[in-house]
Amino acid sequence: LCDRRQRQMCIRDSISDEMRALVRDLLGLPKRQLFVTSTPTDLSFVLTMPGEFDLTGLTYNEVPPAKNVALQKGDYFAYLAQHDLLLALPYQSINPFVDLLYEAADDPDVVSVKITLYRLAGSSRIAAALAYAAEHGKQVQCLLELRARFDEQSNIDYSRMLEDAGCDILYGLTKYKVHTKLCLITRRCPGGICYYTQVGTGNYNEKTAEQYTDLMLLTCLLYTSPSPRDTR
């Protein structure tokens, strides 16, 4: 797909008014498929502009993401065993989830980490945390959707990086894109197995988590083996 995209028909070109009818005829395009606009199709360059100019007096004061005071000590497993945690991005930071992955990697009672990945940030701390967990003996499974539009090559590169670190990589379904944002951490707890689950509306992307409005819920379920009386 990445190679084919370089050879497909163009979707935008800069031409004079005189060339418009000729090009339309040569390409066999009906009028309804030809749009004339002065707006660039790709506006990603706008994201770099604030750093190029002095915007003093033109912007609001920066509001840093709020921190959860209850999590300052960093014992996420103990906290989530007693409380659910709902993060409202970008007003709160995605860092607690990233820290949870690193805590899972270092916790000897954690058995596995399973996660679905769609769009990751460049130099992704989440991908680094998953690789770190696999390198520290955790079973890490990543369902990585390669067909995230315009992020295909990035996802291919991340799949190789994660696989080299020891993660098990799955590539989703043939007919459908996997947009689900789910993470499941399995951990041995006194009395049974604890399932720490994260479900959210936004990608596992630390950069867009500072811009897009999303919700991220972290919760925990303790599963205890049924006693003989319970199985009757």
Regions found by a protein language model. Give the residues of each.
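Single conserved hydrophobic/aromatic residue that forms the stacking wall/gate
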Residues: 1-7, 11, 223-232
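N-terminal non-catalytic structural scaffold regions of very large proteins
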Residues: 4-112, 127-129
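Beta-sheet entry/capping signal
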Residues: 8, 84, 110-114, 139-141, ...
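Flexible loop/turn segments at secondary-structure boundaries
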Residues: 14-19, 43-44, 93-96, 119-125, ...
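Primarily the HKD phosphodiesterase
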Residues: 107-165
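Phosphate/diphosphate-binding loops
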Residues: 146-211
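Mobile "lid/hinge" segments at catalytic clefts and subdomain interfaces of large enzymes
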Residues: 214-222
